[in-house]
């Protein structure tokens, strides 16, 4: 017996047309998979607001010539060693580096780490990509 449950959804025709364009743009094969992904996305956001264990990646680009920048990055990473699982350093060109920090733990702590790294003088861009730890179906 399947665990799949079918249910009906009533939508305004204009909203349905917009949703169908969204499905086409994202290459979904059907509405059901798009709805499942949207539900998962909202449940994931909820995990991040309820202090459940989460995972994610912090990415940032910085000018490695910036005075004392690397020491500040290392100090911050050591301050948050309990949530950092891995880091990857990539040389983009002569001046710019990309760093990817894989994280797992408390969402508040991870957000503080992300904000601290992005606030360092010389960091040109940074973002936090959120995910869960596999609890959402």
UniProtKB/Swiss-Prot annotation:
UniProt GO molecular function: DNA binding; DNA-binding transcription factor activity; nickel cation binding
Keyword DNA-binding applies: yes
Keyword GTP-binding assigned: no
Keywords: DNA-binding, Metal-binding, Nickel, Transcription, Transcription regulation
Cofactor note: Binds 1 nickel ion per subunit.
Cofactor: Ni(2+)
Family recorded in the similarity comment: Belongs to the transcriptional regulatory CopG/NikR family.
Role: Transcriptional regulator.
Protein name (record): Putative nickel-responsive regulator
Organism: Syntrophus aciditrophicus (strain SB)
Native organism taxonomy: Bacteria, Pseudomonadati, Thermodesulfobacteriota, Syntrophia, Syntrophales
């Amino acid at each position: 017996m399947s665990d799949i449950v079918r249910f009906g959804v009533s939508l305004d025709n204009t909203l349905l047309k917009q949703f169908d364009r969204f499905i086409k743009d994202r290459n979904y094969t059907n509405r059901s998979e798009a709805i499942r992904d949207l539900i998962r996305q909202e449940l994931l956001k909820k995990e991040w607001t309820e202090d459940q264990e989460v995972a994610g990646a912090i990415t940032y680009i910085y000018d490695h010539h910036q005075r004392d920048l690397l020491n500040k990055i290392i100090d911050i990473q050591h301050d948050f060693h309990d949530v950092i699982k891995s880091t990857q350093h990539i040389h983009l060109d002569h001046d710019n580096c990309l760093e990817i920090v894989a994280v797992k733990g408390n969402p508040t702590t991870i957000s503080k780490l992300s904000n601290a790294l992005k606030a360092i003088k010389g960091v040109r861009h940074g973002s936090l990509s959120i995910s869960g730890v596999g609890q959402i179906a």
